[in-house]
Amino acid sequence: MMRGRSDGGLKKRLIASVCVVALFVCFLFMYYGSSSQGASALEYGRSLRKLGSSYLSGDDDNGDTKQDDSVANAEDSLVVAKSFPVCDDRHSEIIPCLDRNFIYQMRLKLDLSLMEHYERHCPPPERRFNCLIPPPSGYKVPIKWPKSRDEVWKANIPHTHLAKEKSDQNWMVEKGEKISFPGGGTHFHYGADKYIASIANMLNFSNDVLNDEGRLRTVLDVGCGVASFGAYLLASDIMTMSLAPNDVHQNQIQFALERGIPAYLGVLGTKRLPYPSRSFEFAHCSRCRIDWLQRDGLLLLELDRVLRPGGYFAYSSPEAYAQDEENLKIWKEMSALVERMCWRIAVKRNQTVVWQKPLSNDCYLEREPGTQPPLCRSDADPDAVAGVSMEACITPYSKHDHKTKGSGLAPWPARLTSSPPRLADFGYSTDMFEKDTELWKQQVDSYWNLMSSKVKSNTVRNIMDMKAHMGSFAAALKDKDVWVMNVVSPDGPNTLKLIYDRGLIGTNHNWCEAFSTYPRTYDLLHAWSIFSDIKSKGCSAEDLLIEMDRILRPTGFVIIRDKQSVVESIKKYLQALHWETVASEKVNTSSELDQDSEDGENNVVFIVQKKLWLTSESLRDSE
């Protein structure tokens, strides 16, 4: 929903704008003035301060940022500010839906023992940060992959708490202007690569490679630290969703994404993880400090929901090997629980146990009546995740999986282009799937041709497809050294399970809200008809643009594919966002990807790049 429509002349618009701004500032002062925390958390970018953005390349943006913020662009009857205010520097790492200050201000009554304070709590539109998030002092363009796996700029994530706290575990080490990652972890001080090989050896996988000749492709690492486990699995063609909350281990997911490793901010609390059932072949917890016995095994049952038939759970923790009374008691209770869940010990050696989930429903059906935990209700949807609470029950397999005694997935990489078994759940045919795959391959080739003057082989690493559908955009990038976070809306067909069945990863998300990631974490955003979609929901295009700017790294790219009228509206914000046009191309309405266009309106591919800028305060601090 675009803001600021104008019905009168320029003079009237200016007077009206000034009055509205004055009233709004007064409202903010009265509303937040009583709370020092609220005032410091919002400040609306220090009210309406000027950007003061000096480009590190020496470009002053043609002096446009020196103009008064209240000057409006009246073209096509839309009044749009030529510059957005900049949020206070202290908010350079704000995550709107995971903002502890917002929780305090709203006095939300959350159960800390259930980790509710680490779950999503999104501000209403009137309390959003409608300002640009500044990079921290001394920010530099991130180090390119694959070098970034082992080192990042310290200025980009100025948090050295973990380096000191975990100094004996080789998580990360300060080295001058950089932070290096030796590959260690709490349980694998001598390197994740050796630890991974040892697990593969325990499971008798060929050549001590955990991918089991392509049969093991998707992994969930809970309590992942700085994601070194997932980083070293990439060499084996294993895609890991590294998951952790933004807790006392400051910014661990931010470090992971800065390194170019797939990661997501999330927690095993009260809500289901944002993944469909049967998404992962392997789950991992290395001293993740999770009480798996709480609430009748609720958290372990959530892992069970997202594991595929025959999937593994590797658990490296004192409970698995320590001989003191407390740990022996926990081990006994945990062993009894997983036995009732029909898991079996695949192997137990040294400090690690690996359990395996059954291949079919046979064991569930053979349990004694009244055995806990029970099977979930037959009418329960195991794939519904948006705002759905976890349940302490076992998710049985579908008739297809029970009959085939497994997921029926092809090994990787054939899995990427093979028709997923769950395709029939949506009434899609194999022909539709193959055509979609080929169409997006052509489109991605076209995108890269349009960006050829700007994009080299290592320019982008972290990519997000904001409307992934069946994941064919990501599939088309298989030969590039990138990874894709595939996002599927909770309002449409839940095709995220098809994406996981292709050996890709993703999450469920509504773009009327902020995404669960730190600022400056993605190199490229692909927005296919996202703006048209949110407009139909009555949500703000301006809010989405500001959110995309928050997510996007400086020098990163946005590919917008939408109606021409929508793209023309977006163009009015480029100067305010400090984005510049890279390429623009009309799309034929006969394209099967763009058939929703009304009245024969052409769709447009519009590609922009975010400039690198710092606030004047940050520049002074870095001198």
From Swiss-Prot:
Superkingdom of origin organism: Eukaryota
GO biological process: methylation
Entries under Pfam families matching the protein: Methyltransf_29
Keyword Cytoplasm: no
Cytoplasmic topological intervals: 1-13
UniProt xrefs under InterPro entries: Put_SAM_MeTrfase, SAM-dependent_MTases_sf
SUPFAM superfamilies cross-referenced by the UniProt entry: S-adenosyl-L-methionine-dependent methyltransferases
Residues passing through the membrane, by range: 14-34
UniProt membrane topology term: Single-pass type II membrane protein
Family of this protein: Belongs to the methyltransferase superfamily.
Official protein name in the record: Probable methyltransferase PMT8
Species lineage: Eukaryota, Viridiplantae, Streptophyta, Embryophyta, Tracheophyta
